[in-house]
């Protein structure tokens, strides 16, 4: 009985979840790649991308499905099935994975590098993000095992003015006990933006071999540490974080993300044998955003995921400036040689591996900055 009791420890189950996901990915990876190759599910490279990427045409894609399967099996093996946060993260992850799958399907079957129309993709992202945001507004606020429907009815009955408890506030890192109350609508709006924004940010970053997956592993692992802290009464009190009942269980899921991500990197490292595709990138981004919201570390996610943020901003700035100058001068002008930012450096002469490893180093430093907020307050 004592031997069985050790599995009650979240830290042990997190280690086992990581090892299980890693093993599943490494064992199943070659079979999945071989099957994708036989089915001719190859990458369609955009014509306006760097010329050096044309050699990637035909490389198996949609390998993100392997990541999701490894995460799901590992999480269901080692996590607490009664934990509402585990389920909401899994559902969001697979919801965004479904969007990515449909997008990749159009690219592969119809040989359309653009995939699903942008408006259609955003509609489904916005819908899933909104449902998750409304649910989390009450799930984060409520004590463990509390029914959420009565809370929702109470909020509606109050004329949509019912405040949320302080643990649902927006936490400002590096400052002791500084937070801002959001209210239900503010919480929903912020959560929606974080989930949808992170999903798209990871997807935009996934443009070079190994570029997106390693930062995802690092950020996800760090969020697992935050989940463990805020999910424990003693640690959260000592470190001045809000106590979120049940959040510690997300450490198991974060560990599964780390293990599955490392297994995928084995095959995605330059020169990549397989790409994760939108099915992986959108799903992993959605998972990171959802976990960050639950552990109340939205701003810290912004810091640790700085590479994702800068990649996204580079696209937004490039598109906005191009449209503005085209309207004003009759010819569009660019700020970057090419967007997203990793292509800017490629066109500037950096080797693909240089861009990837340097972005990894930057992410590692940013994650350390994020983790420092556990104590530097």
Swiss-Prot record:
Its main location: membrane. It is a multi-pass membrane protein. GO terms for biological process: cell division; cell wall organization; peptidoglycan biosynthetic process; regulation of cell shape. The chain crosses the membrane at residues 9-29, 59-79, 85-105, 122-142, 155-175, 178-198, 210-230, 247-267, 274-294, 299-319, 354-374. Keywords: Cell cycle, Cell division, Cell inner membrane, Cell membrane, Cell shape, Cell wall biogenesis/degradation, Magnesium, Membrane, Metal-binding, Peptidoglycan synthesis, Transferase, Transmembrane, Transmembrane helix. One of its GO terms (molecular function) is UDP-N-acetylmuramoyl-L-alanyl-D-glutamyl-meso-2,6-diaminopimelyl-D-alanyl-D-alanine:undecaprenyl-phosphate transferase activity. It holds the Pfam family Glycos_transf_4. Its cofactor is Mg(2+). It is an enzyme of class 2 (transferase). It is found in: Cell inner membrane. It catalyses: UDP-N-acetyl-alpha-D-muramoyl-L-alanyl-gamma-D-glutamyl-meso-2,6-diaminopimeloyl-D-alanyl-D-alanine + di-trans,octa-cis-undecaprenyl phosphate = di-trans,octa-cis-undecaprenyl diphospho-N-acetyl-alpha-D-muramoyl-L-alanyl-D-glutamyl-meso-2,6-diaminopimeloyl-D-alanyl-D-alanine + UMP. Belongs to the glycosyltransferase 4 family. MraY subfamily. PANTHER family: PHOSPHO-N-ACETYLMURAMOYL-PENTAPEPTIDE-TRANSFERASE (PTHR22926), PHOSPHO-N-ACETYLMURAMOYL-PENTAPEPTIDE-TRANSFERASE HOMOLOG (PTHR22926:SF5). Catalyzes the initial step of the lipid cycle reactions in the biosynthesis of the cell wall peptidoglycan: transfers peptidoglycan precursor phospho-MurNAc-pentapeptide from UDP-MurNAc-pentapeptide onto the lipid carrier undecaprenyl phosphate, yielding undecaprenyl-pyrophosphoryl-MurNAc-pentapeptide, known as lipid I. This is Phospho-N-acetylmuramoyl-pentapeptide-transferase. It comes from Bordetella pertussis (strain Tohama I / ATCC BAA-589 / NCTC 13251). The gene is mraY.
């Amino acid at each position: 009985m004592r031997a069985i009791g050790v599995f009650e420890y979240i830290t042990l189950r997190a280690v086992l979840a990581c090892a299980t996901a890693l093993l599943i990915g490494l064992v199943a990876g070659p079979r999945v790649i071989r099957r994708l190759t036989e089915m001719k599910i190859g990458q369609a490279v955009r014509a306006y991308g760097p010329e050096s990427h044309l050699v990637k045409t035909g490389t198996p894609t949609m390998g993100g499905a392997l990541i999701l399967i490894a995460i799901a099996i590992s999480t269901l093996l080692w996590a607490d099935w009664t934990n509402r946060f585990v389920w909401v993260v899994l559902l969001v992850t697979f919801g965004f994975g479904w969007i990515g799958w449909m997008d990749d399907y159009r690219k592969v079957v119809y040989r359309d590098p653009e995939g699903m129309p942008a408006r259609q993709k955003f509609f489904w992202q916005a819908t899933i993000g909104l449902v998750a945001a409304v649910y989390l507004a009450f799930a984060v606020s409520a004590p463990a095992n509390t029914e959420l429907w009565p809370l929702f009815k109470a909020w509606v009955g109050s004329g949509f003015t019912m405040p949320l408890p302080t643990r649902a506030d927006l936490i400002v890192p590096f400052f002791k006990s500084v937070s801002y109350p959001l209210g239900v609508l503010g919480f929903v709006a912020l959560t929606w933006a974080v989930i949808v924004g992170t999903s798209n940010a990871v997807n935009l970053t996934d443009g070079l071999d190994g570029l997106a997956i390693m930062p995802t592993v690092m950020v996800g692992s760090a969020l697992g540490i935050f989940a463990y802290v805020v999910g424990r009464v003693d640690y959260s009190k000592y470190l001045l974080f809000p106590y979120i009942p049940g959040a510690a269980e997300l450490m198991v899921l974060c560990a599964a993300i780390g293990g599955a991500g490392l297994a995928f990197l084995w095959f995605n490292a330059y020169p990549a044998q397989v790409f994760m595709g939108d099915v992986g990138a959108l799903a992993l981004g959605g998972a990171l955003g959802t976990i960050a919201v639950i552990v109340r570390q939205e701003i810290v996610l912004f810091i640790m995921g700085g590479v994702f943020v800068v990649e996204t901003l580079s696209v937004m700035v490039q598109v906005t400036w191009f449209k503005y100058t085209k309207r004003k001068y009759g010819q569009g002008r660019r700020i970057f040689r090419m967007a997203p930012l990793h292509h800017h450096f490629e066109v500037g002469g950096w080797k693909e591996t240089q861009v990837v490893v340097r972005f990894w180093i930057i992410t590692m430093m940013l994650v350390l900055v994020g983790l420092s907020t556990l104590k530097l307050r």
